[in-house]
């Protein structure tokens, strides 16, 4: 990421204890290819306090939050992120969530393009995290029966 000018992760975030807590909480999911982890994502019902200021379309429903999606550099551009998005949507539907919320760094154009392609709507404004530089954009996918990805 940093090599592409996308410094959303740094030595302050995410720290190893963040991932350790994700594993302990049972919210970190890994994807393997040929026995090796090629990517991870965190799926949780817990949102960062910064999300409270976002004007969500599904403000009263049960939402799933996707965090910390990371793909090993050798596996970039091989469909892993799309497979994670498929998994996230199926997981949300199977478990009765009405929407999915994600955020991404303002310079992470690849992530923004993928999120938009998947039917997420960018919410107005942005959020900031104290341990990170620059704003993050928030996105939401409503999982109603009439959405374009309804299954």
What are the language-model segments listed below?
Residues 42-68, 76:
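Conserved acyl-donor/pantetheine-binding loop and adjacent beta-alpha core of acyl/acetyltransferases
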Residues 71, 77-90, 113-117:
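Conserved acetyl-CoA-binding loop-helix of GNAT-fold acetyltransferases
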Residues 76, 102-112, 130:
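Conserved beta-strand-loop-alpha-helix junction that forms the acyl-donor binding cleft
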């Amino acid at each position: 990421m940093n090599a592409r000018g996308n410094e959303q992760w740094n030595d302050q975030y995410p720290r190893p204890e963040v991932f350790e807590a994700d594993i302990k909480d049972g919210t970190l999911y890994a994807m393997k290819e040929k026995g090796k982890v090629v990517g991870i994502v965190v799926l949780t019902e817990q949102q960062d306090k910064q999300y409270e200021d976002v004007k969500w379309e599904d403000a009263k429903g049960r939402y799933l939050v996707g965090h910390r999606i990371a793909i090993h550099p050798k596996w970039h551009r091989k469909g892993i992120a799309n497979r994670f998005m498929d998994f996230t949507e199926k997981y949300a539907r199977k478990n009765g969530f009405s929407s999915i919320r994600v955020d991404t760094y303002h310079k992470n154009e690849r992530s923004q393009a993928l999120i938009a392609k998947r039917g997420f709507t960018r919410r107005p404004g942005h959020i900031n995290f104290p341990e990170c530089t620059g704003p993050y954009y928030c996105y939401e996918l409503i999982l109603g029966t009439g959405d374009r990805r309804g299954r």
